[in-house]
């Protein structure tokens, strides 16, 4: 393999979808398109799509340019990630990451989607950059974009996003934010990796400058939700808090992060501080970060956030961090921010912290601190803090700047809060050291400058005067200029004369200080005041006149408009200008003002005394100002100012403006009059809505006395203003119409036309709406119509055809038009006056427009107008013929009188229908004007005359709405004349400078589109003949639309409409030569147009229906440049000629690609024509620069689509279609896609010309093996599959004919099959299986599936074959291949594989190889390759069996396979396989195969092998039989009883032979027993004797155990059927138990076998047999107790007591003879179990001998002691005997037991008492037995046996004194007696003992204390007497008994013998332990009388013991020191 191939293969896992085109095919998954659509786009189309998106993004985001070269260029198109090195891929990953993050902003735009599509399809970012992709899309998680990308991503398990999003990929959908928040929470992601990833998204975006709104919104919301969850849950995890704090601080400190980023941090930051109690260090870090400068944050937002978190932290005292003061100084408008926050939220705590930091450097914060401290609602705490800190700092600092700042702040503060500042001053004075830093009292005193500014605003006049003077003095010195200007500006509006005089005291200084604008702004309120003071105005006028205008004459216009204008008009209540003040306007600087210089005298005259004089003066001034305005050089500005004053709130200014404008309207002439009037109308129109002026009397165009009186007396009333409006509107009637013709019916007009048309329409509107007084309205209308004259009808037409005219106005215009038409005859200038008829047809189109009006009333009046213009048949003078459309009127076509009359009459016939339905007019024209069959030529001429008439008006009428209405009338009329008329209009749009084009360009886009669409609507199928007219413009127009060299703003829209018409049927109606010409022009146009336009053209080309004959001609035309003439002489050609072949290729590509070849009728000549393209391309391959590969591919695709539908082979042959060209293209082309399509064509031609194809079959397969097998795309493998399906069957048929059997067929096909199987490792993984499935189906699965699978398995045996795959991976392919076929084929393969396994295993020991796979082994192969072949075939076989499990398979094949596998399994003992896994694998395979075989067949195979198999085969078959038999269901077993019986019979024979098969035979029988059914018991019984018999023949313990186990199972299974064999079983088992040589396991199993016999058939075991069993078991107990105990239990439970007890009695004799303690214990254990399991009904008859037996047994102690047996042994034996006795007692009731107990008492106490002393040894022994029995009874039965103490009590009273006196000295008896008494006290519960009995017994018991002192007490074994007395004390609560007991024992402590004292103290200690609480009352006497003495005892041991007793008492009572003193 080449090194390049190795490299490609090594990275196949990174890019499994291999790239196939010249630059590689795109990834199969798509972001934008569904899979079926995505597969149709190759890399070039995706690149073009990406380029368009990238270009659009570049215009939006120029920074995208950095990715152009690397990701969006031609070189990027060739970038193949598969062949890049790791370093190159890493660099590319970084670039892609940056690009994806920048694209995050544009994801919702289509342009962004296009770029992402490119990155998915080209760079596979959805697989290789998944994390970056998901990060970019996460902000859009709830939009459709997110599931679109999520559905295609492949998330690696190592990604932090895997756990969250991998489960969602399959069913991708928008996800809620709550899901993401849960995923990043510590409960879901303990590593917090995902949280860190998301938290860092904004930081990364800021770093790269790619922040966008969606990202910030997502980030903030996610962080907030995460913290909200923690807030309402268990709190925030420490790791989460750490990550969030770090993220927030980092973002807040990021330079130039911007306002949006910082705003995004604030909500989660505040929530964090409120949710989590942060430590001081992270909190300080957050606070410090909020003060970081240069971050681009909004200062208000940041400071508010800081204040919020500081205010929430109530105990914060660590300040704002280092450099906080300096950073605060950099906050813009800090003071205003703090004041606003203080007003709204108070924030007192936080404000203290911030102000404290600012006060550290007050010079830096002087302005901000002043703003805060001067606030009226400043908290007291802040005031106190500021006072203290400023005093301390100001007194201690050496810096003059700091001291000045402190002083300024303190003085201002003291003015507002004197008491607080003074208190702080006193406190500071007391705290500071007087000597070093005395408090500076000057800090709290204001400087003189500040006093001055305060005085300026003082209420006192004198203070204001002083302040003004001081401020002016300061300003003169250059101090506080800005503040001075502000203060002086404020005082300019002062109304006190003294203050004003003070201001103007130094006029020059004032001018120098105040800018003119500031002066005018300051003084303006005085002039515009409601009640101005004239003498104050006079002072200001003096200054303006004498100083201001002298220094600043340029301010004259501003002074006139801002100050003087409102004071000109005098009213009754407002007279700002007296005569003396008015005269001031005549002098000084006012003389230089334009307006005042001409009206000075009038102003003076106007100010006469008296009201009438004032009214007249107002009019005089207004006219004078109007005249001044008229002559002004700034006329337009003045008019604008006057119109603006019409809205003034100051009535004087407003009314004066009305008066001036009124005068101007009347005096102006020409354009100025018109423009001024229009401006006034424009202003008034919207403001009069809702007002009515009709009730204003005496209103006209003149300014009358009533009007002026209202102005003077009632200026504020609305009615006065309305009168002024009516007066000025009435004056509009004096406006004179411009000289010359006005084109009323035109959308375009000259300036003068437009102005007057607008004016006339406005006046007409005012005159016709019910607002104006009637006389004014009539006057305006009469004036207007008088000036219009004959043009009135055209004017009316312009009104009703205008869409902007209201309905009432349209109706009025129509009515006026009707009146005009009737009155026209009376006009002197009218032709009717001379007796000539008047033809009004020129307005007929306008009437038609009115007939389509939306309002019914309009249509009704329009009908009346239509009737009025009907006229007669004569052709009179045509009204307005030359003027209606201005210069375009000559284009108007007139109707003949006949046509006119007929047309109007026809209209009038249905006129009422027009009124009812506005659409009826269109339907009428459609009916009348459409061509109708049967109509004569005259009718056609009439119809065309009307169409021509209407279309001429369309061409002349340059107004969009009328044109559209008229065109709509003809939209459904089909006539060629419409198109002829429309073409000139359309053609004129080619020239952008033409009038038509310029006019259309001025319209809105919507209207342009409607108009062009309406014109192009005339291009219909019915008008196609116009396109073919000689000399016509139609065809040229269409071709020009396809001429890319022509540019026009409308050509693209026209082209699209023409395309629509062509597709709509026009193209199909063209002649063939026209179709060819159009298609060629269209193709050339596609290559010359921009991309988007070209795409539209391509879509049109695709939709055009082209017939095959035209297609053939087109192909000839388009491919002509590719044809090479042999005889053509070589000559120099220019560059255009050289590029012509390339251009032809592109044109052919466009054409071929546009056709839907599957829908084109199949034609062999057409195929031949396409083949000719391929032939021509072969000759031009070296010349053509680009596109040849794609063209070949498309041509092949076209050929394929046609050939697939051709069924007649003769047709192909007649057309001379061959395969040679196809083969040549395959050899010549380097593009795999071309060759693939060629293969498809070749495959399809194989059906029609098979001989030619088969002749070239080897080149086909050579190509496939060399290229296509290694490519990964669906198309390539579709080609391969089709090729295989067509050609492979032919070859396999030949092979089948030559082979005799399957092995021979496999061998002959080996070379052929190896071609494919050798390529398996180089095929793309996901394509491999589908290919081989298709291959096998083509070969024939029944014949070839097995050998193909064998060869695929054989690949795994060599490294080269595996091709770097693992063995398991290599074996997956054959397994998956088999899985694709049905069960029958799989079963057949199973048999073949088993046979091949047999052959391979056989070949291991043969020289001549037989197996199929042995043929693949060469001399150079490793020696273990055959073993690997076997191993891997077994593995493959297992996978087949897994697929067949549970399926119905052919039993014959499976049975054969099973038999073969069993034989193979038996033969795996060869040395060569000993060290391999082959044997175990073979067994597993056999087990799996058995699952496929029916039980009947399996048993049959077993029976056959048992009869004719070798020893190894028999062992193996028995093993399989044992393993599989339990799996057979009972109903199946019932059916197979005979077979199983036969098998058991043969197994019996094997057991009798005792050979190597014994163990396997035993396991087989065991398997039968465990699952046997009743019908098999007979056969099993026949095997039992042979099994028992074989036990004695074998020596191996394991086999013996197995046989015994089998006997046990047989006995339990067969029950009574085993009776004949009981003796042999018992003998065998007992002999094994007695044997000393056997292993323990064999002995154990022998006991189990015995138990099974006893449990199963107990009644059939004889006494002799039982005795043997008992004796043997008792003897064996010496060796091991467990088995014996188990057998004892079994005997006691299963054998009846009546039968067993005599045997026990008999056995007792044998046991006594042996005399061993172990045997005795075993016997008594057996006796105990017998009595325990005895039936109560059996006991009465046995009781006497049983009790006698026990009495004899109880005397055993004596007999044993005589033999010298150890006492411990005697006690153990006795305990065993007593235990047996107790079991007997358990079975008895009291009446039966009591006599027995009395008899036992007599036996122990009385029988031997006569004649013997009390200490006789035998008597003592019997008493000990009695007490042992009693102890056992008390222990077992508790208080139930307490009454029986009464029987013993007399003898106890005898024994205790006897022990005390020393007459009885048996310590065991004494000990047992006291223990019995203690146990009796313990369990009594009042059953026997009473206080009297206890008191009676007490002295005797206390007398036992000094006895047997050598017995040392211990916690584990206390002295018997101490325990007895403690139990006595614990059994009673009687004070009398306890006191006596305590006293008696205490008295014993006074014994002279220290040992006795110790014994007494031990007893006393035990007593107090048992009953301390009840004996508390005895403490004084016990402690003070006895223990006090004992604590001083001479014996140290006694003292220690006494202290121990005292300590126990003190645990209950506390300290007892008082009793010891």
Swiss-Prot record:
Disulfide feature: none
HEAT repeat feature ranges: 837-875, 976-1014, 1281-1319, 1935-1973, 1977-2015
RNA-binding as UniProt keyword: no
Major place of residence: nucleus
Keywords: Nucleus, Repeat, Ribonucleoprotein, Ribosome biogenesis, rRNA processing
GO BP terms: maturation of SSU-rRNA from tricistronic rRNA transcript (SSU-rRNA, 5.8S rRNA, LSU-rRNA); positive regulation of transcription by RNA polymerase I
Domain of life: Eukaryota
Entry annotated with the keyword rRNA processing: yes
Annotated InterPro entries: ARM-like, ARM-type_fold, BP28_C_dom, HEAT_Utp10/HEAT1, U3snoRNP10_N, UTP10
GO molecular function, a single term: snoRNA binding
GO cellular component: 90S preribosome; small-subunit processome; t-UTP complex
Location relative to the cell: Nucleus, Nucleolus
Family: Belongs to the HEATR1/UTP10 family.
Subunit structure of this chain's protein: Component of the ribosomal small subunit (SSU) processome.
Role of this protein: Involved in nucleolar processing of pre-18S ribosomal RNA. Involved in ribosome biosynthesis.
Protein name: U3 small nucleolar RNA-associated protein 10
Species of provenance: Cryptococcus neoformans var. neoformans serotype D (strain B-3501A)
Gene: UTP10
């Amino acid at each position: 393999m080449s090194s390049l191939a190795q490299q490609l293969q090594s990275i196949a896992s990174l890019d499994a979808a291999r790239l196939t085109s010249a630059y590689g095919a795109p990834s199969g998954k798509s972001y934008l398109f569904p899979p079926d659509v995505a597969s149709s786009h190759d890399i070039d189309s995706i690149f073009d799509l990406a380029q368009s998106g990238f270009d659009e993004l570049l215009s939006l985001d120029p920074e995208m340019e950095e990715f152009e070269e690397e990701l969006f260029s031609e070189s990027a198109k060739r970038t193949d990630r598969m062949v890049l090195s790791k370093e190159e891929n890493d660099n590319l990953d970084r670039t892609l990451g940056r690009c994806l993050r920048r694209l995050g902003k544009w994801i919702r735009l289509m342009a962004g989607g296009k770029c992402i599509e490119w990155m998915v399809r080209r760079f596979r970012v959805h697989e290789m950059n998944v994390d970056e992709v998901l990060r970019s899309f996460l902000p859009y998680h709830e939009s459709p974009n997110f599931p679109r990308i999520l559905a295609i991503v492949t998330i690696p398990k190592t990604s932090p996003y895997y756990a969250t999003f991998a489960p969602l990929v399959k069913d991708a959908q928008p996800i809620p934010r709550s899901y993401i928040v849960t995923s990043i929470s510590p409960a879901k992601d303990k590593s917090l990796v995902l949280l860190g990833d998301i938290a860092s998204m904004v930081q990364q975006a800021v770093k790269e400058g790619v922040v966008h709104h969606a990202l910030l919104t997502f980030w903030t919301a996610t962080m907030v939700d995460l913290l909200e969850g923690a807030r309402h849950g268990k709190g925030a995890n420490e790791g989460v808090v750490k990550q969030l704090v770090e993220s927030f601080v980092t973002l807040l400190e990021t330079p130039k992060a911007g306002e949006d980023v910082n705003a995004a941090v604030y909500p989660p930051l505040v929530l964090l501080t409120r949710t989590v109690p942060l430590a001081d260090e992270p909190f300080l870090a957050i606070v410090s970060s909020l003060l970081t400068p240069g971050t681009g944050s909004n200062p208000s937002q940041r400071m508010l956030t800081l204040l919020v978190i500081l205010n929430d932290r109530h105990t914060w005292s660590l300040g704002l961090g280092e450099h906080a003061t300096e950073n605060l100084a950099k906050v813009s408008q800090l003071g205003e921010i703090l004041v606003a926050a203080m007003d709204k939220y108070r924030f007192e705590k936080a404000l203290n912290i911030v102000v404290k930091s600012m006060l550290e450097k007050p010079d830096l914060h002087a302005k901000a601190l002043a703003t805060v401290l001067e606030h009226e609602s400043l908290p007291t705490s802040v005031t106190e803090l500021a006072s203290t800190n400023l005093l301390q700092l100001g007194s201690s600092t050496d810096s003059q700047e700091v001291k000045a700042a402190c002083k300024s702040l303190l003085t201002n503060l003291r003015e507002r809060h004197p008491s607080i500042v003074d208190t702080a001053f006193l406190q500071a004075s007391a705290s500071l050291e007087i000597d070093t830093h005395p408090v500076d009292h000057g800090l709290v005193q204001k400087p003189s400058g500040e006093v001055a500014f305060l005085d300026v605003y003082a209420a006192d006049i004198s203070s204001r005067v002083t302040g003004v003077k001081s401020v002016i003095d300061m300003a003169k010195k250059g101090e506080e200029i800005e503040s001075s200007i502000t203060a002086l500006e404020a005082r300019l509006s002062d109304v006190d004369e003294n203050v004003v005089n003070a201001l103007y005291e130094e006029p020059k200084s004032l001018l120098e200080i105040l800018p003119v604008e500031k002066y005018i702004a300051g003084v303006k309120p005085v002039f515009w005041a409601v009640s101005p003071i004239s003498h104050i105005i006079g002072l200001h006028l003096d200054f303006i006149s004498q100083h201001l205008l002298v220094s600043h004459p340029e301010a004259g216009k501003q002074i006139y408009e801002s100050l003087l204008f409102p004071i000109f008009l005098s009213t009754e209540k407002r007279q700002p200008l007296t005569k003396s003040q008015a005269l001031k306007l005549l002098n000084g600087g006012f003389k230089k003002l334009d307006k005042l210089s001409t009206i000075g005298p009038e102003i003076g005259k106007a100010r006469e005394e008296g009201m009438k004089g004032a009214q007249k003066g107002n009019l005089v001034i207004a006219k004078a100002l109007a005249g001044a305005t008229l002559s002004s050089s700034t006329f337009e500005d003045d008019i604008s100012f006057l119109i603006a004053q019409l809205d003034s709130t100051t009535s004087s200014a407003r009314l004066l403006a009305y008066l001036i404008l009124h005068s101007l309207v009347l005096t102006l002439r020409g354009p100025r009059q018109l423009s001024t009037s229009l401006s006034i109308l424009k202003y008034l129109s919207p403001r009069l809505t809702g007002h009515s002026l009709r009730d204003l009397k005496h209103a006209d165009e003149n300014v009358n006395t009533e009007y002026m009186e209202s102005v003077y007396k009632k200026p504020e009333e609305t009615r006065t203003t309305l009168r002024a409006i009516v007066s000025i509107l009435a004056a509009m009637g004096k406006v004179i119409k411009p000289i010359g013709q006005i084109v009323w019916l035109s959308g375009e007009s000259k300036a003068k036309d437009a102005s007057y048309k607008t004016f006339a329409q406005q006046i007409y509107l005012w005159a016709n709406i019910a607002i104006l007084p009637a006389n004014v309205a009539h006057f305006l209308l009469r004036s207007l119509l008088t000036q219009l004259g004959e043009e009135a009808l055209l004017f009316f037409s312009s009104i009703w055809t205008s869409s902007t005219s209201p309905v009432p106005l349209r109706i009025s215009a129509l009515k006026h038009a009707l009146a005009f038409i009737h009155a026209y005859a009376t006009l002197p200038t009218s032709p009717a006056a001379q007796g000539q008829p008047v033809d009004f047809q020129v307005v007929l189109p306008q009437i038609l427009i009115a007939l389509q009006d939306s309002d019914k009333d309009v249509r009704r009046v329009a009908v009346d107008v239509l009737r009025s213009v009907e006229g007669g048949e004569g052709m009179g003078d045509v009204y307005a013929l030359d003027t209606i459309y201005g210069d375009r009127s000559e284009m108007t076509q007139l109707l003949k009188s006949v046509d006119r009359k007929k047309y109007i009459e026809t209209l009038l016939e249905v006129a009422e229908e027009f009124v009812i339905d506005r659409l009826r007019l269109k339907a009428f024209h459609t009916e009348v004007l459409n061509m109708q069959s049967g109509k004569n030529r005259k009718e056609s001429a009439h119809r065309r005359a009307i169409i021509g008439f209407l279309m001429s008006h369309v061409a002349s009428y340059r107004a969009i709405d009328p044109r559209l209405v008229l065109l709509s009338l003809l939209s459904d009329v089909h006539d060629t004349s419409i198109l002829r008329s429309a073409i000139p209009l359309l053609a004129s749009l080619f020239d952008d400078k033409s009038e038509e084009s310029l006019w259309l360009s001025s319209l809105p886009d919507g209207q342009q589109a409607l108009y062009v669409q309406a014109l192009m609507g005339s291009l219909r199928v019915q008008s196609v003949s116009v396109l073919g007219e000689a000399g016509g413009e139609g065809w040229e127009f269409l071709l020009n639309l396809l001429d890319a060299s022509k540019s026009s703003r409308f050509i693209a829209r026209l082209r699209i409409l023409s395309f629509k018409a062509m597709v709509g049927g026009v193209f199909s109606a063209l002649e063939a030569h026209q179709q060819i010409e159009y298609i060629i022009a269209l193709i050339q146009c596609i290559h010359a147009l921009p991309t988007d336009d070209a795409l539209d053209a391509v879509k049109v080309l695709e939709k055009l229906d082209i017939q095959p004959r035209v297609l053939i001609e087109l192909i000839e035309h388009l491919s002509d440049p590719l044809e090479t003439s042999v005889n053509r002489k070589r000559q120099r050609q220019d560059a255009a000629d050289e590029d012509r072949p390339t251009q032809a290729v592109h044109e052919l590509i466009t054409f071929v690609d546009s056709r839907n070849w599957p829908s084109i009728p199949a034609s062999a000549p057409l195929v031949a024509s396409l083949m000719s393209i391929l032939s021509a391309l072969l000759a031009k391959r070296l010349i053509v620069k680009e596109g040849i590969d794609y063209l070949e591919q498309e041509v092949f695709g076209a050929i394929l689509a046609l050939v697939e539908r051709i069924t007649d082979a003769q047709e192909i042959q007649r057309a001379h279609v061959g395969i040679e060209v196809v083969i040549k293209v395959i050899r010549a082309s380097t593009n795999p896609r071309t060759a693939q399509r060629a293969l498809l064509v070749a495959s399809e031609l194989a059906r029609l010309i098979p001989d030619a194809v088969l002749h070239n079959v080897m080149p086909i397969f050579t190509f496939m093996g060399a290229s296509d097998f290694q490519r990964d795309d669906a198309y390539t493998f579709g080609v391969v599959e089709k090729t295989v399906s067509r050609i492979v069957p032919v070859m396999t048929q030949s092979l089948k004919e030559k082979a005799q059997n399957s092995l021979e067929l496999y061998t002959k096909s080996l070379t052929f099959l190896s071609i494919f199987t050798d390529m398996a490792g180089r095929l793309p993984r996901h394509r491999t299986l589908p290919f081989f499935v298709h291959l096998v189906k083509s070969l024939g699965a029944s014949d070839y599936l097995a050998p193909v699978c064998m060869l695929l398995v054989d690949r795994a045996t060599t490294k080269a074959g595996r091709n770097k795959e693992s063995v398991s991976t290599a074996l997956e392919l054959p397994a998956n291949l088999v899985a694709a076929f049905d069960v029958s084929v799989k079963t057949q393969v199973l048999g073949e594989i088993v046979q091949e396994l047999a052959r391979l295993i056989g070949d291991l020991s043969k020289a001549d190889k037989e197996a199929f796979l042995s043929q693949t082994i060469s001399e150079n192969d490793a020696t273990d390759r055959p073993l690997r072949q076997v191993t891997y075939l077994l593995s493959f076989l297992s996978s087949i069996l897994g697929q067949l499990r549970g399926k119905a398979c052919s039993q014959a094949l499976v049975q054969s396979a099973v038999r073969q596998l069993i034989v193979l399994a038996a033969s795996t003992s060869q040395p060569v396989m000993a060290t391999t896994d082959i044997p175990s694998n073979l067994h597993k395979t056999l087990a799996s195969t058995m699952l496929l075989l029916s039980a009947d067949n399996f048993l049959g195979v077993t029976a056959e092998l048992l009869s004719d198999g070798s020893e190894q085969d028999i062992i193996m078959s028995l093993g399989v039989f044992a393993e599989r038999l339990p799996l057979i269901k009972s109903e199946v077993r019932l059916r197979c009883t005979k077979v199983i019986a036969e098998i058991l019979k043969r197994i019996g024979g094997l057991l009798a032979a005792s050979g190597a098969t014994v163990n396997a035979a035993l396991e087989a029988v065991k398997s039968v027993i465990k699952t046997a059914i009743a019908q098999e018991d007979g056969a099993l019984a026949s095997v039992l004797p042979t099994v028992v018999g074989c036990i004695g023949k074998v020596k191996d313990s394991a086999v013996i155990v197995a046989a015994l186990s089998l006997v046990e199972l047989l006995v339990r299974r067969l029950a009574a059927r085993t009776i004949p064999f009981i003796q042999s079983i018992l003998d065998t088992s007992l002999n094994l138990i007695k044997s000393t040589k056997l292993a323990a396991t064999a002995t154990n199993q022998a006991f189990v076998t015995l138990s099974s016999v006893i449990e199963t058939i107990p009644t059939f075991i004889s006494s002799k047999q039982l005795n043997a069993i008992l004796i043997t078991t008792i003897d064996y107990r010496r060796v091991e107790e467990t088995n014996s105990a188990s057998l004892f239990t079994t005997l006691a439970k299963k054998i009846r007591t009546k039968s067993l007890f005599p045997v026990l009695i008999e056995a007792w004799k044998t046991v006594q003879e042996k005399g061993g303690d172990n045997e005795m214990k075993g016997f008594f254990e057996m006796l105990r179990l017998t009595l325990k399991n005895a039936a109560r009904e059996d006991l009465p008859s046995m009781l006497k001998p049983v009790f006698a037996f026990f009495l004899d047994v109880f005397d055993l102690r004596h007999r044993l002691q005589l033999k010298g047996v150890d006492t411990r042994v005697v006690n153990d034996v006795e305990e065993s005997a007593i235990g047996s006795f107790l079991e007997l007692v358990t079975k008895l009731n009291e009446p039966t037991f009591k006599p027995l107990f009395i008899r036992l008492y007599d036996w122990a106490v009385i029988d031997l008492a006569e004649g013997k002393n009390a200490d006789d040894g035998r008597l003592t022994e019997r008493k000990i037995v009695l007490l042992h029995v009693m102890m056992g009874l008390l222990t077992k039965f508790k208080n139930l046996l307490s009454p029986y103490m009464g029987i013993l009590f007399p003898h106890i009273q005898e024994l205790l004194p006897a022990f005390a006196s020393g007459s009885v000295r048996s310590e065991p008896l004494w000990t047992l007696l006291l223990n019995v008494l203690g146990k009796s006290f313990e369990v009594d519960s009042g059953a026997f003992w009473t206080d009297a009995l206890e008191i009676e017994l007490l002295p005797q018991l206390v007398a036992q204390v000094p006895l047997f002192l050598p017995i040392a007490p211990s916690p584990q074994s206390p002295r018997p007497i101490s325990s007895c007395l403690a139990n006595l004390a614990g059994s009673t609560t009687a004070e009398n008994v306890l006191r006596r007991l305590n006293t008696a024992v205490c008295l014993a402590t006074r014994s002279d013998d220290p040992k006795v004292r110790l014994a007494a103290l031990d007893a006393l200690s035990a007593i107090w332990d048992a009953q301390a609480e009840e004996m508390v009352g005895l403490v004084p006497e016990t402690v003070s009388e006895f223990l006090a003495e004992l604590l001083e005892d001479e014996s140290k041991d006694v003292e220690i013991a006494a202290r121990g007793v005292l300590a126990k008492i003190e645990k209950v009572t506390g300290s007892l020191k008082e009793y010891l003193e």
